Amino acid sequence: MPGFLKMLFPLVVVVVLMTPYPASSTAQHPDRLVYKGETVPIFSNPLETFFDASHRRPYFPRGSTACWRGYIATWKIENEYMYLVRMQDCTQEKKEIPLATVFQDRPEPVKADWFSGTLRIPRGNMLRYVHMGYGSVYERDLFLTIEKGKLVGEQVVDNTKTRVPSEDERAIDELTKLKEWEDNIRKNRE
């Protein structure tokens, strides 16, 4: 284990043990994206950035620690723009969540014009499983760059030809992301 990870390990243990429910969760059920005629999992949660942008987050029942956000969203990219087309809860019943629960004044499908970021689409076989967030590593990752809802870039990374981060590195990365998400939820509730 590299020196900096040895120093961070006790901190990570303390954070994991003291962090409430969402950040101590398991690998997550991903959102879905219809892209080029194929429905694929995305290891990104674009809707969370909408809530982080001062819009109140409705209550979504959490049916599982594998779905800390309480919903699974289905997206599509059509004519270079990203749209939210469907939401369902994470309970055993997988009930449909009306998009109007979040977007009262927008037509469906909802154009994701609030989202700027990167969508990660895993491809190929899993090289390393990480039991947290979206930390697992696959043979390839397709990264789609979105700016204000518009697809502006696409890049494939071949993980078989690059150094695969250690499980500790992936876990620290996922813990950091989950902690940021949790902090944003708390801030929006205040």
Protein language model features and the residues they cover:
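Intrinsically disordered, low-complexity acidic regions enriched in Pro/Ser/Thr
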Residues: 20-190
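Bacterial N-terminal signal peptides that target proteins for export
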Residues: 1-9
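Bacterial N-terminal signal peptides
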Residues: 8-20
